[in-house]
C-alpha cells in the first residue's frame, strides 16, 4: 500500500512539474507561434526575416561555448543537497563571465565572419544576456521554485512581444530590432529573477569552491558537443539554404532562409511539447529512485504516443494554417512535413 502511494506521488509530482513548466515554456513558445505570423507582416521583405533568423542562430551557436554547458550543471549540482547553493550559482556565473571574456578576445577574428562586422555587437550582447537568463532560470529551477519559473516565463513572453512591437513596428529597425527585442526580453527576465529570488545573495566571490567548480565543469563540458549537434540538426539548414539557394526563382539566400524559418512555425508545437516535458523530467529523473525502470517505461510510452498524434495532426493542418501568414510566405508549407518528422525524432533525443 505504501509502495503504491509512493508510486502515485511520483506520477503526481511529474504531472505537477510538467504543468508548471508548461505555463512557463508554453508562454515562451506561444510567443513564437504569435510572433512568426506577426513577423511576416512587420518585416518589409522576406529576406529581412531570413537575415534576422540567421543572426540569432549565430548567437545560439556561440552560447554553448560561452556558457561551457553550465546550464546542465546548475540543475545537476543545484538539486544535490550536499552542495552549497551559493557556490553552485557563483561557479556558474564566473564560468559564463569567463567564457564571455574569451569571446571578446576572439573579436579580431570573429569580425571577419559573414554579417559579424555589422551585427557583431548585438550578437555578443544577445549571447551574454541569453547565458545569464539561462543561469538564473536554471538556478531557480534547481531550488524548485517552480511557480516563480512559470511567472518568469509569462513575464518574459509579454516583455519580448512588447519590444517586438516597439522596435519592429514603431521604430522599424528590421534585423537590429529583432535582436534587440530578444535581448530586452532576456534582460527583463534576469532583473525579475534577480529581485524576486534575491539571487545576489547567492553570489559569493570569496572562498570559491574550486573542487566543486571542477566537478561542474567535468559534468558540463561534455555537454557542449551535444548542444552543438542539436544546433547543427535544428539550425545549420538555414545557412546551407542561404548559400545553396541564392538566386533560385529570383530570391536571394536570405529570402529562402526566411521561408524555411517560417516553415518551422508549426513544428515548433512539437518541440514545445518536448521541451516542456524535458524540463519536468529533469527533476523527476534525478529525484525519483524507487521503481525507476517501470516508471521510465510507462512515461516513455505515453510520451511517444502523444508526439506521434501531434505530428500527424500538424501535417494534416499545415496548408490551411499557413494562410494566416502574409501571402508571399505561403510557399513555406512545403517544408512543414519534413520539419515535423525531424522535430519528432529530435524530441526523442
Report the location of each language-model feature.
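Interfacial segments at transmembrane-helix termini and the short loops linking adjacent helices
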Residues: 46-47, 110-126, 251-254, 314-347
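Interfacial transmembrane-helix starts/ends
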Residues: 15, 53, 83-97, 217, ...
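Signature of the first transmembrane helix
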Residues: 9-71, 103, 107, 126, ...
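Alpha-helical transmembrane segments and their helix-entry boundary regions
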Residues: 21, 49-50, 87-88, 119-122, ...
Amino acid at each position: 500500500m505504501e509502495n503504491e502511494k509512493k508510486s502515485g506521488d511520483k506520477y503526481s509530482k511529474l504531472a505537477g512539474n510538467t504543468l508548471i513548466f508548461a505555463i512557463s515554456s508554453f508562454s515562451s513558445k506561444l510567443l513564437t507561434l504569435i510572433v512568426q505570423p506577426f513577423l511576416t507582416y512587420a518585416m518589409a521583405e522576406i529576406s529581412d526575416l531570413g537575415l534576422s533568423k540567421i543572426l540569432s542562430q549565430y548567437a545560439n551557436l556561440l552560447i554553448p561555448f560561452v556558457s561551457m554547458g553550465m546550464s546542465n550543471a546548475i540543475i545537476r549540482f543545484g538539486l544535490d543537497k550536499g552542495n552549497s547553493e551559493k557556490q553552485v550559482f557563483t561557479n556558474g556565473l564566473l564560468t559564463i563571465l569567463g567564457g564571455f571574456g574569451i569571446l571578446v578576445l576572439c573579436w579580431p577574428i570573429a569580425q571577419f565572419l559573414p554579417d559579424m562586422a555589422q551585427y557583431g555587437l548585438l550578437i555578443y550582447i544577445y549571447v551574454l544576456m541569453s547565458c545569464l537568463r539561462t543561469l538564473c532560470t536554471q538556478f531557480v529551477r534547481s531550488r524548485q521554485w517552480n511557480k516563480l519559473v512559470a511567472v518568469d516565463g509569462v513575464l518574459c513572453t509579454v516583455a519580448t512581444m512588447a519590444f517586438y512591437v516597439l522596435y519592429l513596428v514603431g521604430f522599424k529597425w528590421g534585423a537590429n530590432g529583432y535582436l534587440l527585442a530578444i535581448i530586452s526580453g532576456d534582460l527583463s527576465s534576469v532583473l525579475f529573477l534577480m529581485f524576486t529570488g534575491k539571487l545576489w545573495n547567492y553570489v559569493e566571490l570569496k572562498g570559491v569552491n574550486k573542487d566543486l567548480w571542477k566537478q561542474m565543469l567535468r559534468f558540463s563540458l561534455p555537454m557542449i558537443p551535444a548542444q552543438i549537434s542539436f544546433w547543427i540538426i535544428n539550425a545549420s539548414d538555414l545557412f546551407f539554404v542561404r548559400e545553396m539557394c541564392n538566386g533560385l526563382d529570383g530570391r536571394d539566400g536570405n529570402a529562402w532562409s526566411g521561408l524555411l524559418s517560417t516553415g518551422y512555425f508549426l513544428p515548433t508545437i512539437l518541440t514545445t511539447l518536448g521541451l516542456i516535458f524535458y524540463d519536468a523530467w529533469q527533476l523527476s529523473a534525478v529525484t525519483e529512485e524507487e521503481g525507476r525502470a517501470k516508471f521510465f517505461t510507462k512515461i516513455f510510452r505515453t510520451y511517444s504516443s502523444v508526439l506521434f498524434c501531434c505530428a500527424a495532426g500538424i501535417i494534416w493542418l499545415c496548408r490551411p494554417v499557413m494562410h494566416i501568414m502574409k501571402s508571399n510566405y505561403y510557399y513555406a508549407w512545403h517544408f512543414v512535413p519534413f520539419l515535423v518528422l525531424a522535430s519528432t525524432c529530435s524530441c526523442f533525443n
